Amino acid sequence: LGQYLRELNNEILPALIDEYALDTEKLAYGGYSLGGLAATMSLWETDAFAAVFSLCGSFWYPGVADFIEEHVPKNYSAQVYLQNGIREGEGHNNRLCDAYSYAQRVHTALQATCGAKTVLDDYGHHDRQSERLNAALRWVERVL
């Protein structure tokens, strides 16, 4: 994940900025599931993004919640939006069954360090994807 984020920050993002004349003060990065985890972890790699959002971020990966609780993000001034469901992980018999508790830990940590806007809804991981994305995009419009 670190290599991906470094490539995004050092190669892909500069190329996009050059090609499309993007306003570097209003860049947002977000994703769903593993993409949400990647967007969240970008907070420790770069301060290029003014807003970061994660929908059902895969915070259950080993060591992720611990890292987020123990380290202050490089981009602590970013606007952050996290949304997870209380039924994420239902039906699994591995560490995924605790997805909700990992999400709670990450939400609490990023509220403390970044003032993150957090939403814990009543749904599972794959439920209401369009609704969740629309809520996140409305949030991005408000904060940027």
Predicted regions and their residues:
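Non-catalytic cap/lid and distal C-terminal segments of serine-dependent acyl enzymes
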Residues: L1-L144
